[in-house]
Curated annotation (Swiss-Prot):
GO CC term, one of those recorded: cytosol
Reaction catalyzed: 2-formamido-N(1)-(5-O-phospho-beta-D-ribosyl)acetamidine + ATP = 5-amino-1-(5-phospho-beta-D-ribosyl)imidazole + ADP + phosphate + H(+)
EC class (word): ligase
Coiled coil: none
Keyword RNA-binding belongs to the record: no
UniProt xrefs under InterPro entries: PurM-like_C_dom, PurM-like_C_sf, PurM-like_N, PurM-like_N_sf, PurM_cligase
Cellular compartments annotated: Cytoplasm
Protein name as annotated: Phosphoribosylformylglycinamidine cyclo-ligase
Keyword terms: ATP-binding, Cytoplasm, Ligase, Nucleotide-binding, Purine biosynthesis
Gene Ontology molecular function: any one: ATP binding
Amino acid sequence: MTYRDAGVDIDAGNALVERIKPLVKRSFRPEVMGGLGGFGALFDLSGKYKEPVLVSGTDGVGTKLKLAQQLGRHDTIGIDLVGMCVNDVLVQGAEPLFFLDYFATGKLDIDTAAAVVGGIARGCELSGCALIGGETAEMPDMYPPGEYDLAGFTVGAVEKSQLLDGAQVREGDVLIGIASSGPHSNGYSLIRKIYERAGAPADLVLDDGVALIDALMAPTALYVKPILALLKSHGEAIHAMAHVTGGGLTENIIRVIPDGLGLDIDATAWILPPVFAWLQREGAVADAEMWRTFNCGIGFVLVAAPAQAAALEQALDAQSLAHWRIGQVVTAQGDERVRIG
């Protein structure tokens, strides 16, 4: 009896590595030492930072993965995986340096795995982050046929003096919301239930002319390069940042706001994108549930000094990033620290 007889095909794993090597190498940075296949991946941090603080992050894509598998759309879910991780470390002002992925399945399908890892490599390339390693685990009997799971891990760095931890946030600071590309990778357990119960036709088109399926599967926006450029040119104006993920607008921005302060968010400052309007209508989802489940069109938030907010907005315009002033920092009123109205 062989390992292949037991359900693990080492040759398929090796073939996958050869297939993805060119894609992975396109994401490499000069600091990457060596190639693929070592027991550990190497990254040279010397020379670039005076007092580097390493910032780590790990995440998955939730049950958006189920929808991707249901629809056979494997080429962009890897971008989602990268976005969920690198956008998180970006919040503290860190530049993502390198990324590792974990792909697990019951039986390895080389084409599917290559499409997924290709998306991861593309996401890393778009974020200036090197895909320096990963693990492909073929585990018979652990997953149903055709299913796989994903996890991502990233490490970034920021100068200690430039670390953003929310300590500078003051009452009166302005909230500048930057547009999301869609639901990103959060709320998909609810999204899938609404989608199934609505019985929407496969070719349903939303009010903005985008097919519903395309809107639901739009890759998570990658904010790294434009925000790092903004930090370099207008860093003194940014007191904190937030990545709007699980918990939506209600629970994410407040994570970077000091005790004693709260948020007053103006829900009329931007128009709810059609994909979220469809979800709310078809699912009969209450406003409060929308705010704490989805990003509702705001994927990333800058907490800015009011006197410099206009300059930040001009810089965002120059980078063609859609944005709105969505509220301000206020004194907290009792236990209610976030008001959306």
